[in-house]
């Protein structure tokens, strides 16, 4: 279970400023 991966997927659905810090895109 990769928390960062889940967050990145959620960001694709609902973008969030925090996503940019955690995820490459």
Swiss-Prot record:
It is found in: Target cell membrane; Secreted. GO terms for biological process: defense response to fungus; defense response to Gram-negative bacterium; defense response to Gram-positive bacterium; disruption of plasma membrane integrity in another organism; killing of cells of another organism. GO terms for cellular component: extracellular region; membrane; other organism cell membrane. The keyword Disulfide bond applies. The keyword Disulfide bond applies. It comes from the Eukaryota. Disulfide bonds join 8-23, 11-19. Keywords: Antibiotic, Antimicrobial, Disulfide bond, Fungicide, Membrane, Secreted, Target cell membrane, Target membrane. Its main location: membrane. Antimicrobial peptide active against Gram-positive bacteria M.luteus (MIC=0.8 uM) and B.subtilis (MIC=1.5 uM). Less active against Gram-negative bacteria E.coli (MIC=32.5 uM) and yeast C.albicans (MIC=18.7 uM). Not active against S.aureus and P.aeruginosa. Has no hemolytic activity against human erythrocytes. Probably acts by disrupting membranes of target cells. This is Panurgine R. It comes from Panurgus calcaratus (Solitary bee).
């Amino acid at each position: 279970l990769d928390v960062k991966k889940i967050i990145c997927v959620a960001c694709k659905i609902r973008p969030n400023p925090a996503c940019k810090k955690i995820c490459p895109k």
